[in-house]
A protein has these predicted regions:
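Transmembrane beta-barrel domains of bacterial outer-membrane proteins
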Residues: 1-293
Length: 293
């Protein structure tokens, strides 16, 4: 007799009911992204979810910093099955990798509330439209297209393109290409490239990162990463980063603890000298999901 799925559950329950091994890059990537709390995976899921994260960070340049994030998606089936309420820091698919994982909490974006309309849903193609309000009561709208391979191969390609308008700042675009490849021992190699243009920029922001992610068990995962962040005008690399994220599901299916030490070589402006500093993040996250019945 099959166990009935709970109406409300800790997101760790989803992984504990699945086997660790996967020969599919898409399947393993989904598990990794859900475990590490990557916003894309929750926003595109069939369930509602909320993640509340407290963040403590330190680096030798900015000293200690503290932050709180609320992210997630709440389906609104009584209004329309294709409409959801989104809590997000992101425009379209996301800010660049550097902003989401900067060595200072204060450099990360604050949470915004948006209504999202799922315009089309196919196995490979999805199109979303989002309208929301920023904390200063400025409006913002965006459209996001996502293409992803629909296959069981060990390699998976994903491309997303977002176009958006911010009241007071003008138009912008965000592009992301991501390549996942499954290795032995439940390991995943991920190469991610981001480019952002905005009317207020003289050029573009870009990020390229390489990660090796590994599930150690249903409760533990590790990610080693290196990334380069820069701007095109004036052309310079704003940071080189090396680090590791160690994340564990603790005590309850809805509670995660994460430690992220690393080292960054920063250049905060074109005319400034590059500085190197170690950094460390400590995150405690509550992650709860709900099926719509």
């Amino acid at each position: 007799m099959e166990q009935e799925e709970p109406a409300v559950f800790g997101l760790g329950w989803l992984d504990q009911t699945q086997s660790i091994a996967s020969n599919s890059a898409n399947g393993l990537a989904m598990r990794m992204d859900r475990f590490f709390g990557v916003q894309r995976i929750d926003i595109e899921a069939a369930y509602s979810s909320l993640r509340l994260t407290t963040i403590q960070s330190w680096n030798d340049i900015d000293d200690f910093d503290t932050g709180v994030r609320l992210r997630g998606k709440v389906h609104l089936p009584r209004i329309n099955e294709r409409i959801s309420l989104i809590f997000s820091e992101e425009d379209g698919d996301g800010t660049n990798y550097y902003t989401q994982n900067a060595a200072s909490v204060s450099e990360q974006n604050t949470t915004r509330m948006n209504l999202e309309f799922d315009l089309t849903e196919q196995s490979r193609h999805r199109l979303f439209f989002r309208v929301g309000m920023r904390s200063n009561l400025k409006g913002r709208i965006s459209a996001r297209y996502r293409y992803e391979q629909d296959s069981d191969s060990r390699t998976n390609n994903r491309f997303t393109q977002s176009l958006y308008f911010k009241d007071g700042k003008g138009f912008g675009s965000f592009s992301r290409y991501q390549l996942d490849h499954v290795l032995a021992n439940e390991g995943l190699v991920r190469w991610t490239n981001d480019v952002r243009f905005e009317e207020t920029y003289t050029g573009a922001e870009y990020t390229s990162s390489l990660e090796y992610l590994q599930l150690r068990s249903n409760e533990t995962a590790v990610s080693w990463y290196g990334r380069v962040n820069g701007v095109t005008s004036p052309g310079y690399v704003s940071s080189y980063d090396l680090g590791v994220r160690m994340r564990r599901n603790i005590y309850r299916e809805w509670l995660y603890l994460e430690l992220e030490p690393g080292y960054t070589w920063r250049k905060d402006a074109y005319a400034l000298a590059r500085e190197g500093t170690p950094y460390i993040f400590l995150r405690l996250e509550m992650a709860i999901g709900s099926y719509n019945r």
